Regions:
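Structural detector of well-ordered beta-strand residues that form the stable sheet scaffold
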Residues: 33, 72, 93-96, 122, ...
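Short secondary-structure boundary segments
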Residues: 75-76, 148-149, 182-183, 196
Length: 235
């Protein structure tokens, strides 16, 4: 058990991200209590306590909210409606706001919002059936990437479509609300994290992420790229 003298932060999710968050919070005097469906989750040993409960369990959320000063989440599988309801009921602030979670948990809504904001994204279609995928193939050509709109991570919820013969099997793999994207050829993948305070937004250094079979295996910091590219990423 770790106890700090400052505020207490509740984190929904206790995976590797939750562990790193708790480790970073301790030197700042921030206590961390986590909740996760898995007992002895990665963040549990470095947090003050862990509650065991599902990501859509209102009772677990309520108990967590009543024990902390602020709530956050480290995984997108949380039900934003439940989180919003518990926050209002207990007057415990949630950051980011549950409305933000509702936006980012759905890949299609996320892509639509980014496109509306003028951020470059791969060409995409909403998928309600096989014809939508075939229409995308006619417009974009193969290969395509079929993605589950919700719940995908670490390669789960993705299915590559290299030709017409892959379409049915890809739809069977996803088996739910989906979107399809044009395939993007790239040299490397860069990632950047932004942080928002009361009156300003700042960024951490740009990193390079290396994936194998769609699972992150290595992060290189600082990213191996030219200054102009790094500045474009920050902007």
């Amino acid at each position: 058990m770790i106890t700090a003298p400052g505020p207490t932060l509740g984190v929904v999710g206790a995976g590797q991200l939750g562990r790193m968050l708790a480790e970073a919070a301790a030197p700042l005097g921030v206590d961390v209590v986590v909740s996760d469906p898995t007992e002895d989750a990665p963040a549990a040993p470095v947090a003050r306590d862990q509650l065991v409960g599902g990501f859509e369990d209102p009772e677990t959320f309520r108990e967590l909210a009543e024990r902390v000063d602020y709530l956050t989440f480290e995984i997108e599988l949380v039900d934003p409606d439940v989180l919003r309801e518990i926050s209002e009921e207990t007057d415990t602030p949630v950051h980011p706001h549950p409305d933000t979670l509702a936006l980012i948990e759905d890949k299609l809504v996320q892509k639509q919002r980014m496109a509306e904001a003028g951020i470059p994204v791969p060409a995409f279609f909403e998928v309600n059936g096989i014809q939508d995928v075939l229409d995308a193939a006619e417009e974009f050509g193969y290969p395509l990437m079929l993605k589950a709109r919700k719940g995908g991570y670490d390669g789960r919820g993705n299915a590559a479509i290299y030709d017409r013969h892959d379409v049915e099997s890809a739809l069977e793999v996803i088996d739910g609300p989906a979107m399809v994207e044009a395939y993007v050829e790239y040299e490397r993948e860069l990632a950047i994290m932004g942080v928002k305070g009361e009156d300003e937004i700042d960024t951490f250094p740009v990193t390079e992420t290396i994936h194998e079979e769609e699972i992150l295996r290595e992060t290189v910091s600082p990213a191996r790229s030219d200054d102009e590219t790094l500045e474009r990423a920050r902007e």
